[in-house]
Amino acid sequence: VHLTGEEKSAVTTLWGKVNVEEVGGEALGRLLVVYPWTQRFFDSFGDLSSPDAVMNNPKVKAHGKKVLGAFSDGLAHLDNLKGTFAQLSELHCDKLHVDPENFRLLGNVLVCVLAHHFGKEFTPQVQAAYQKVVAGVANALAHKYH
């Protein structure tokens, strides 16, 4: 991902304020509610029968935190996203058979959640930088797909 110095600074400054557990759980929960077909990858998560059930599901929250932990690793290695996400790409492709489009959907949901949490601080410039990052992460996660 090519970010200017200003964009990198905007991304890392805001990310330093992100509650990974809260934002991760909300982002994954919203993905599962807004795009219900993504729920099929989470059969072991128990009750996903309603938006409330999804948003309050402890397994959704825990996995959302894990997902954003990996995203944090990506932010620390913006110049090598493909390398950073190579193993996760392989796992999601070969073992989990996740449609790579879901990575793009989750990235866009994450941007919405960040905008919701940070309001005016999430300026159009910050959003543009984050859109570049989530697109880069989605591409890196899709890299191992045949």
Curated annotation (Swiss-Prot):
GO terms of biological process kind: hydrogen peroxide catabolic process
Gene Ontology CC entries for this record: blood microparticle; haptoglobin-hemoglobin complex; hemoglobin complex
PROSITE patterns: GLOBIN (PS01033)
GO terms, molecular function: haptoglobin binding; heme binding; hemoglobin alpha binding; metal ion binding; organic acid binding; oxygen binding; oxygen carrier activity; peroxidase activity
UniProt cross-references to CDD domains, sorted A to Z: Hb-beta-like
The keyword Isomerase belongs to this UniProt entry's keyword annotation: no
Tissue: Red blood cells.
Source species, domain of life: Eukaryota
Keyword list, A-Z: Acetylation, Heme, Iron, Metal-binding, Oxygen transport, Phosphoprotein, S-nitrosylation, Transport
N6-acetyllysine carried by residues: K59, K82, K144
Positions of post-translational Phosphoserine modification: S44
Residues modified as Phosphothreonine: T12
Modification sites for N-acetylvaline: V1
Residues annotated with S-nitrosocysteine modification: C93
Keyword Glycoprotein recorded: no
Name of a matching Pfam family: Globin
Binding site for heme b: H63, H92
Residue stretches making up the Globin domain: 2-146
Record InterPro entries: Globin (IPR000971), Globin-like_sf (IPR009050), Globin/Proto (IPR012292), Hemoglobin_b (IPR002337), Hemoglobin_oxygen_transport (IPR050056)
Family, per entry: Belongs to the globin family.
Subunit architecture: Heterotetramer of two alpha chains and two beta chains.
Reported function: Involved in oxygen transport from the lung to the various peripheral tissues.
Protein name per UniProt: Hemoglobin subunit beta
Native source species: Saguinus mystax
